[in-house]
Amino acid sequence: MSDRTTLDLPAYGLGAAGLGNLYAAISDEQAYATLAAAEQAGMNLFDTAPHYGHGLSEQRIGAFLSKKDYRPAISTKVGRRLVPVGSRDMPDNGFESPAPFIPEFDYSAKGIRDSFVSSQKRLGVDVVNMLLLHDVGEKTHGDAHEAVLAQALDEALPEMAALKAEGKTKWIGLGVNEIEVCERVLDRIDLDVLLIAGRYTLLEHDNSLPFLDECNRRGVRVIIGGAFNSGLLVASGNEPLRYDYVDAPEWAVERVGQMREACAVYDVPLPAAALQFCGAHPAVTSVIPGARSAEQVHQIARWTEMEIDPGLWNLLREKCLISKTVPVPS
């Protein structure tokens, strides 16, 4: 069993994909203000990746930290290398005005180490608290999934373990949107942590609950990303309704509407219920909602601190909107 006692994480951290201009561009100044607000709110875990803005998110975090003594826990990822765009067309990965690089999958041992060294330079750090293998899974790789998984098991994860042994990171694990690949990897390799995005949420948890229960039994820590299901659980007004990074399906929109009505009975904002729900499972060590402005961070902090009447969880169960057996805040 890995030593998982060496890293204390806050209950809530910051998902930094938005700092890489996910969906819309923000200025450097807005990114720095977002990070400063997270520091003020005690959200002392920044989760980033080379993929986010093609290096831009890491660059902005590095620039922010270079001017301060503040040292949050940092999580970044490997599995893609950034290649100068040159004369090629920039791919549409959902990031507006990304840095001039193209992310290319590379799960080889050399690719993992080269990616990590590049992240060190962008972040301006020698050591990261967590190093996660990014986006291994069938939905990402399709027909190539089995070959990718084999290389991840044979090369990528052993190289990450070597980086951990060298003191370059404290924890290693996966950063994924799929439960099945987590199960398959854990059958072969003892990991410290799993960052699971969008699969354990107020809206969607029936399929993932047994796996989180197993993580708790095995002592594998879980970080929850995508607590708002790509923004669907927090969208208001005329904001786009997204689920799993694409337009939300009708069933999801309808179910979220029913949840919002139940929350209104207890005068609880749906996003507050969504965040606090994710953190209630004993396997979960941190929840990392994304934010792209100081105002959003301050709002998230208010939601996490809000007292929620236990009657809300009972009502959601009565309406069959959450599992009868899922842990809820007490």
Task: Describe the residue ranges of each PLM region.
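Short, flexible, mixed-charge acidic loops at enzyme active sites
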Residues: P84-F95, S236-L241
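Conserved, mostly hydrophobic/aromatic
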Residues: L14, A31, F46, I61, ...
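Beta/alpha (TIM)-barrel catalytic core signal, keyed to glycine-rich beta->alpha loops juxtaposed to Asp/Glu
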Residues: Q30, V136-S323, P327-S330
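Active-site mouth loops of central-metabolism enzymes
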Residues: A17-E29, S97-R113, H145
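Short, acidic/polar
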Residues: A25-A38, S108-R122, N177-R184
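Short, well-ordered coil/turn segments that N-cap beta-strands
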Residues: T6-Y12, G42-N44, D69-P72, V125-N129, ...
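N-terminal binding-site loop/beta-alpha segment at the start of enzyme catalytic domains
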Residues: M1-P84
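Active-site groove signature of glycoside hydrolases
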Residues: Q120-G142
